[in-house]
């Protein structure tokens, strides 16, 4: 990992790893089951999650000269509250869908953003077509983009932009998947669809 300002001389980083077992029937993605028209469902992030902190620190502290207790414009939060928002867990709303075989793929949106993470779960014959009007980029990300001089294409490849997880469901199951997510108080929405392509992400 590259985390400027975190690894100080004489300090060490201790990392933990979890190894698990999954039933073969539950493995995702199911590439052979994916087809044009399958629905992309977005789940919101709670903030930066684990990516974009070097940019955020540069913008907030170096460029804008903000303190941790200063308000972060447009967010209704302090800089500390916005940047230290806990990476939310998607286990509770998503695992029942996995166990019920309601999904054909899912992508955790980490470093690389939507542009790089979704293709990891796509066959080479399909593209993920993202409807950019389906959600509003949260104020935190808009602030970082504006003050950091980050264009939308670069932002899509560096930040989650408010989308923390993307689920892929068959078209005839998408409504039921959305209903289950909403019943679990998950504010999910239709983010886009799969179209013929080469395993990339396209924005509309």
For every predicted segment, state its role.
Residues 1-54, 193:
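Glycine-rich anion-binding loops of enzyme active sites
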């Amino acid at each position: 990992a590259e985390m400027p300002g975190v690894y100080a001389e004489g300090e060490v980083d201790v990392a933990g790893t979890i190894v698990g077992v999954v039933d073969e029937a539950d493995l995702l993605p199911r590439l052979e089951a994916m087809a044009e028209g399958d629905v992309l469902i977005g789940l919101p992030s709670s903030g930066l999650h684990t990516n974009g902190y070097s940019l955020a620190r540069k913008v907030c502290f170096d460029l804008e000269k903000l303190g941790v207790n200063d308000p972060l414009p447009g967010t209704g939060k302090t800089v500390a509250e916005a940047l230290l928002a806990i990476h939310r867990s998607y286990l509770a709303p998503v695992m029942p869908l996995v166990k019920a075989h309601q999904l054909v793929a899912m992508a955790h949106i980490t470093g690389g953003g939507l542009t790089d993470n979704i293709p990891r779960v796509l066959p080479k014959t399909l593209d993920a077509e993202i409807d950019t009007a389906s959600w509003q980029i949260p104020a935190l990300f808009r602030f970082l983009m504006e003050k950091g001089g980050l264009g939308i294409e670069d932002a899509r490849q560096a930040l989650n932009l408010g989308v923390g997880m993307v689920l892929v469901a068959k078209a005839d199951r998408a409504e039921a998947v959305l209903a289950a997510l909403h019943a679990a108080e998950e504010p999910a929405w239709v983010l886009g669809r799969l179209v013929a392509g080469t395993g990339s992400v396209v924005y509309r």
